[in-house]
Swiss-Prot record:
Entry domain remark: The probable endonuclease active site in the N-terminus and the basic amino acid cluster in the C-terminus are important for the shutoff activity. The C-terminus acts as a nuclear localization signal. The C-terminus is recruited to host protein complexes involved in nuclear Pol II RNA processing.
The organism of origin for this protein: Influenza A virus (strain A/Swine/Wisconsin/1/1961 H1N1)
Function: Plays a major role in the shutoff of the host protein expression by cleaving mRNAs probably via an endonuclease activity. This host shutoff allows the virus to escape from the host antiviral response. Hijacks host RNA splicing machinery to selectively target host RNAs containing introns for destruction. This may explain the preferential degradation of RNAs that have undergone co- or post-transcriptional processing.
Residues under site feature: Important for efficient shutoff activity: 202-203
Keyword match Amino-acid biosynthesis: no
Location in or out of the cell: Host cytoplasm; Host nucleus
Entry protein name: Protein PA-X
Protein family according to the UniProt entry: Belongs to the influenza viruses PA-X family.
Keyword terms: Decay of host mRNAs by virus, Eukaryotic host gene expression shutoff by virus, Host cytoplasm, Host gene expression shutoff by virus, Host mRNA suppression by virus, Host nucleus, Host-virus interaction
Gene behind this protein: PA
Amino acid sequence: MEDFVRQCFNPMIVELAEKTMKEYGENPKIETNKFAAICTHMEVCFMYSDFHFINERGESIIVEPGDSNALLKHRFEIIEGRDRNVAWTVVNSICNTTGVGKPKFLPDLYDYKEDRFIEIGVTRREVHVYYLEKANKIKSEETHIHIFSFTGEEMATKADYTLDEESRARIKTRLFTIRQEMASRGLWDSFVSPREAKRQLKKDLRSQGQCEGLPTKVSHQTSPVLKTLEPMWMDSSRMATLRASFPKCLEK
């Protein structure tokens, strides 16, 4: 799984995920499923904000790569992936500037058009189950929740999906690609099932002669940036085009 993560994700995302795990005492080389989960969540957050700007009339517009955006304001402030202290500084600054209530937990993004924080989730389970867990934890009507699954399902607060359909399709396609690449390497089942993941972890450590003295029980402490993962969909009419925008993972 570690090799898969390093081959299939942008090096910047991998570096941020490693830094986050180490901040919480987690080892990317041991808790490889969590490593993959964090990288996936970070990439979804970055894709969520990609190409979205606000023009001089306050309208949300999409600017494709290569087009001029020098005079435009980014629609989304990315909070996910920042150092914890820096992230809270950004949140406090946004709250002081906009008057929006301060969230209890660090959100992932801030939407300058809708003036709201956004919590992104990526789940391997039913989207409505994970959505309710998020809502019960956050307990704030001011933070907008948007959940994606690997099955192509999504759920958002008040059915407000924030982004246009094509932007969301890009995210779903990327999740589909990740799932397919994992499956082709025999990694998907252990990624979905915690029990299988634990069994695989012990097997890997044993094969490396590292079992003694090393923890084989996966930590249940959850990093704020870690959102659970799972299964996927794709509209066949645009799958080839959208999927081509992502580099194919290298075979081992």
